[in-house]
Curated annotation (Swiss-Prot):
GO terms for molecular function: magnesium ion binding; phosphoglucosamine mutase activity; phosphomannomutase activity. It catalyses: alpha-D-glucosamine 1-phosphate = D-glucosamine 6-phosphate. One of its GO terms (cellular component) is cytosol. Keywords: Isomerase, Magnesium, Metal-binding, Phosphoprotein. The lineage of its organism: Bacteria, Pseudomonadati, Pseudomonadota, Gammaproteobacteria, Vibrionales. GO terms for biological process: carbohydrate metabolic process; peptidoglycan biosynthetic process; UDP-N-acetylglucosamine biosynthetic process. HAMAP family: GlmM_B. It comes from Vibrio campbellii (strain ATCC BAA-1116). Activated by phosphorylation. Its cofactor is Mg(2+). Binds 1 Mg(2+) ion per subunit. Its EC number is 5.4.2.10. This is Phosphoglucosamine mutase. It holds the Pfam family PGM_PMM_II. It comes from the Bacteria.
Length: 446
């Protein structure tokens, strides 16, 4: 079997709705192919959640039809954060969990991603087996063996209680005012309740999904509205989740953005303070040098993985460590969850705020972020701009100018047709001009 994936990217199957492969007929067949493979594994039970995109209804029906044709039973949770589906898959002893979401992407995109029975991303061999089944014609099981669909009405309540259980029982969020931005996404009916039930004064925004407003000028990918609201409300801090609840970006009381690197640093330092840190921290190639240096000053080991929470997880498991993060807001805490969980990560930072009696702003000052600029260049076709001589020359020139006081990273996005150009260094103006220079070279080579 070839290890070359045709459909599965770094985070499942994703694309624009109505365009292959995110079409009703393909998703039906994907459900059947997954069902064929999963039926050989055990219970024939699958948990299905989704975010708030209007296309979720269509894709949910197609997916369930395919699973039923393969003889699997589907349990629907309705709109539910990705990490909640991972949790429910474990607690219900299901063979797999499936999430219909395109995470932080616009509403017109959608995707399908799978979790194993342990609540982790599917192993490579299972994904490849599913792709192999997609080459076959659909064969329906006998009528008596067809799968049924049921709905889990208390899914939200179960997950809310789990999230609360990860917050120290001797602490409370009483007298803490929090602005919670749910991006009109899957956390809209969950996150505000978690923090309210722990005692916080919650101001909720991004909690009116209409099918087309997910991630639209709100949430973890655009915190400007949250920054303004935190200052207006004189809140202690703000929390921004992405559309499917696996990314968290925070805002301090002054309106400053606190990214995934800073969040992981705060959590690791607090674990060290309490004598509970197990190993070090895993970041990615995009992790800010400031985080690496900040951890080094504390004597906390740090390694970089490839970009993508899948690769952060691989490094965590290989090293036996518990804390991993991407600066985009994926934070994985393996002593509490099996995948990136934005609500749980936020609760650990809040525990540090309350337990240390320090502000989020003060906690974030332990590390100094280097100026970092990210330029995204859209490309089409099968060409590889990263191999163009003009791009290579541009990168070499910038690296020579930065010397040992900065770095350059170019990579293809695993979820979108983008080339990501990242430049980081001590000199903000040089970093900005260098990123634009390389981005122009990439555009000219596309």
């Amino acid at each position: 079997m070839s290890d070359k994936r045709r459909y599965f990217g770094t985070d499942g199957v994703r694309g624009k709705v109505g365009q292959y492969p995110i079409t009703p007929d393909f998703v039906l067949k994907l459900g059947w192919a997954a069902g064929r493979v999963l039926a050989k594994q055990g219970t024939k039970k699958v948990i299905i959640g989704k975010d708030t995109r209007i296309s979720g209804y269509m894709l949910e029906s197609a997916l369930e039809a395919g699973l039923a044709a393969a003889g699997l039973k589907a349990t629907f949770t309705g709109p539910m954060p990705t990490p909640a589906v991972a949790y429910l898959t474990q607690t219900f002893r299901a063979e797999a969990g499936i999430v219909i979401s395109a995470s932080h992407n616009p509403y017109y995109d959608n995707g399908i991603k799978f979790f194993s029975s342990e609540g982790t991303k599917l192993p490579d061999d299972i994904e490849l087996a599913i792709e192999a089944e997609l080459d076959k014609d659909i064969e329906c099981v006998e009528s008596a063996e067809l799968g049924k669909a049921t709905r889990l009405n208390d899914a939200a309540g179960r997950y809310i209680e789990f999230c609360k259980s990860t917050f120290p029982s001797d602490l409370s969020l009483a007298n803490v005012k929090i602005v919670v931005d749910c991006a009109h996404g899957a956390t809209y009916h969950i996150a505000p309740n978690v923090f309210k039930e722990l005692g916080a004064d919650v101001v909720a925004m991004g909690v009116e999904p209409n099918g087309t407003n997910i991630n639209a000028e709100v949430g973890a990918t655009d915190v400007r509205a949250l920054q303004k609201r935190v200052v207006e409300e004189q809140a202690h801090l703000g929390l921004a989740f992405d559309g499917d609840g696996d990314r968290i970006i925070m805002v301090d009381h002054l309106g400053n953005k606190i990214d995934g690197d800073q969040i992981a640093y705060i959590i690791a330092r607090d674990a060290l303070r309490r004598g509970e840190l197990k190993g070090g921290v895993v970041g990615t190639l995009m992790t800010n040098l400031g985080m690496e240096n900040g951890l080094k000053q504390l004597g906390i080991p740090f390694v970089r993985a490839a970009v993508g929470d899948r690769y952060v997880m691989e490094q965590l498991l290989a090293k036996g460590w518990k804390i991993g993060a991407e600066n985009s807001g994926h934070v994985i805490l393996l002593d509490k969850v099996t995948t990136g969980d934005a609500i749980v990560a936020a609760l650990q930072v809040l525990a540090s705020v309350v337990g240390s009696e320090m502000t989020l702003h003060d906690l974030s000052q332990g590390m100094t972020l280097y100026p970092q600029v990210l330029e995204n260049v859209r490309f089409v076709g099968n060409s590889n701009p990263l191999e163009a001589q003009a791009v290579l020359d541009s990168v070499a020139a910038v690296e020579a100018e930065l010397g040992d006081k900065g770095r350059v990273l170019l990579r293809k996005s695993g979820t979108e047709p983008l080339i990501r150009v990242m430049v980081e260094g001590e000199d903000a103006e040089l970093v900005q001009s260098s990123a634009l220079k390389i981005a122009e070279a990439v555009k000219a080579s596309c």
